Amino acid sequence: MENVSKPGSRQRSSLHYLFCGLFRRRSTLRGAGSFLAQCLPVFLSLLLLPALLGSCRRDAVPDADPADGQDPPVVVVDSVLTQIRVQADGRPVRRLDLFIYEADGLRALEKQYAFDELQEELNIPTLPGEKLVVGIANSPKRFNSKALERYDAMEQLSFNFADDDPAQPILGGFALTRREACEVQLQPLLCGIRLARVSNTMDGYELLENPRVRLRDLPNSAEILRLLEFRPAELIDAGAWTPLPYDVGFFSQDPGITLWCYPNDTPEDVLGVPRPYLEFECSIRGTNCSFEVPLPPLSRGCMKEVELTIDGPGSHSYNIR
């Protein structure tokens, strides 16, 4: 039978024998160690293949349009310098807190600052638009900014009378900016009742012995930003007694005593809401006697003077100015 070879078969056979011969020759010359050295790059390529494929994945951030050829626009928030003046009328300030609220919308808190002393003039960068600026001085406690992030909450902020100090009274005030400027006038909550004079008109030169004075029905707290209509929800029954320096005899005495309370401007003709009153106590011929002086409506930060005249154990008169 005639052997028929297909075209190209001789060429494949020659290549096969050539490859086998080369492989046998390499194996003879270099041995098994040379074969492992040749395979090592293949193994390394297989190990690096997942990392190379991962580096080819697209980024999650969309690319800029190459046709644009420009950087993305930068959003710039405009700001203005707001001039704030703070006045305390010479009262001592050991700490000043400033709160800047937006005047419109939700009236949200925009900025808050704290200073160790009075800052009479400040230039503060704010967002454009009218602002409500609140100043509080000599606060006995630190503020919770989260609780005061709306102006409505600031309007309800109250301080307790027991935490106030006449030597460094709590001060507060607010103002609305006009053309990026405002002036905040800080005012105290405390009202002062000064016993200006005590007179003894009794016959027989009886003395008013061991005299002392105090206030009763004191408001327990007050809102720091309120200007009018102070209606206390809770009262303190009585303040501490303050003794007069001397017994009161023939000559009138000016004790120079000032008693303090929070405001209560309830009109005198309104029933059911007690107002503070001054209580004067002394001993007359061995008998303890008490005299009451109802106080007029007390506005925020006011000062009243009381002149008291004792005519006998059950008789007295007074003048308030």
What are the functions of these language-model segments?
Residues 6, 285-288, 311:
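Extracellular low-complexity Ser/Thr/Asn/Gly-rich intrinsically disordered segments
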Residues 153-192, 196-200, 292-321:
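Extracellular beta-sheet/turn segments enriched in Thr/Pro/Gly and aliphatic residues
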Residues 82-85, 90-148, 200-302, 320:
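Tryptophan-paired
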Residues 1-54:
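Sec-dependent bacterial lipoprotein signal peptides
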Residues 19-22, 41, 58, 263, ...:
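Residue-level detector of bioactive/disordered segments in secreted/extracellular proteins
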Residues 34, 39, 53, 62, ...:
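Short stretches within intrinsically disordered, low-complexity N-terminal or propeptide regions
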Residues 50-83, 195, 301, 307-312, ...:
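Bacterial Sec-dependent N-terminal signal peptides
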